[in-house]
Amino acid sequence: DGLHRFFVGKNAKVRYVEKHYGEGDGRGKRVMNPTTEVHLEEGASMILEATQISGIDDTLRKTIATLAENATLEVQEKVLTTGEQNAVSEFVADLNGAGSSCNIVSRTVARDKSTQHFSSTLNGNAACSGHTECDSIIMDSAKVSASPQLTAANVDASLIHEAAIGKIAGEQLLKLMTLGLTEQEAEERIVSGFLK
């Protein structure tokens, strides 16, 4: 578990990259529950890139953000789960300042018997813009759920959510297989491109 707190001052810019990977001999459960708090002052901006590619058996990833006037936050999350792994991502952003904006994009792939849940809450408390998007590829016997929530407390708050869960299209596989790839190689190529 870890707690990361960012207090980004007026007109300051931060880019934070977080990559999680677990490995070991399989005798213990690899659990990672990071919490990230972001407090953006007037005109501040932050890009948060969070990637979890493999090896984490169980994770609860929480991101909480408050945005002041003209602050901007961009979150890019990429998650791959396999086996019986479980990944939960929770995002809450309070857009408190006029002109603030938040863009959350999560791209995930769930394989085997793994499970994933994505939840995002955008609270538009001022004239602001917010967008949350979750795109997931589901394979094998995996389970994926997405629950975006938008709350506007200002008539000039513009909030959008998008969620898509689906399998790899057969025609995509066929096209790559006609180029000489095996079905497994074609799947790997598609997953790699999706998470890029």
What are these model-derived regions, one by one?
Residues 1-181, 191-196:
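Conserved beta-strand/loop scaffold segments within soluble protein domains that form the structured core
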